[in-house]
C-alpha cells in the first residue's frame, strides 16, 4: 500500500492500514487526519526506503535506550516475537532495547483513546532510564567519596 503513494495522491487502503479499527480513535481525529488528499512530499521518499534501508541505518546509530511499542492491531510493522527480536537486533549501539504492546490501539498509538496509557508507559520507561543512570553514578564508592569531601 505504502509503495503506491505519490506526491499527489494517497493510495487506496491507506486509511485501513493506519487507522483501524476505527472505533479506537476519536471521530475528530479520524476526520481531521484522514481527509487530506495528499501526504507531505517527504513521506513519499521516507516510506519508499524506510524498512529496508533508512530504519536499519538509523537504528544502528541510536545510542540511547529504546522502548519500541507496537499496537495490538498493528498493520504497518510485522510485530510477532521473531519480528520484534529482529528489530531489536538492529539497535546495536543501544544499551537497552525493550518491546511492548499497547492494547486497544491501531498503528497510530499517540492518537487513539489509549494515548494517555501509551504516553504514561513512555514516561515510565524514561524514569527507569534516569533511575538506572543515577544508580550507576551513585555507586557505594562514589557515595563514600562524596561523604568524605562533605565531612
Predicted regions and their residues:
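Alpha/beta-hydrolase
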Residues: 1-80
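N-proximal short alpha-helices
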Residues: 31-35, 91-99, 139
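Generic structural microfeature
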Residues: 54-57, 94, 117
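Short amphipathic alpha-helical segments and helix-helix/interface helices
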Residues: 56-59, 87-88, 123
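Hydrophobic, Leu/Ile/Phe/Ala-enriched alpha-helical segments that form helix-helix packing faces
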Residues: 59, 91, 126-130
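Conserved loop-alpha-helix segment in the C-terminal half of the alpha/beta-hydrolase fold
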Residues: 72-105
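Catalytic active-site module of serine/aspartate enzymes centered on a nucleophile-bearing elbow/loop
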Residues: 96-151
Amino acid at each position: 500500500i505504502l509503495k503506491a503513494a505519490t506526491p499527489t495522491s494517497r493510495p487506496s487502503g491507506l486509511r485501513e492500514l493506519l487507522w483501524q479499527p476505527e472505533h479506537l480513535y476519536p471521530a475528530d481525529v479520524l476526520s481531521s487526519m484522514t481527509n487530506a488528499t495528499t501526504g507531505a512530499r517527504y513521506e513519499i521518499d521516507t516510506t519508499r526506503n524506510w524498512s529496508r534501508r533508512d530504519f536499519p541505518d538509523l537504528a544502528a546509530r541510536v545510542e540511547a535506550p529504546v522502548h519500541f511499542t507496537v499496537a495490538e492491531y498493528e498493520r504497518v510493522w510485522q510485530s510477532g516475537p521473531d519480528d520484534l527480536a529482529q528489530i531489536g537486533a538492529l539497535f546495536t549501539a543501544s544499551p537497552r532495547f525493550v518491546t511492548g504492546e499497547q492494547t486497544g490501539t491501531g498503528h497510530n498509538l499517540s492518537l487513539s483513546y489509549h494515548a494517555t496509557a501509551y504516553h504514561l508507559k513512555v514516561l515510565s520507561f524514561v524514569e527507569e532510564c534516569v533511575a538506572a543512570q543515577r544508580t550507576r553514578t551513585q555507586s557505594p564508592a562514589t557515595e563514600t567519596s562524596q561523604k568524605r569531601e562533605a565531612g
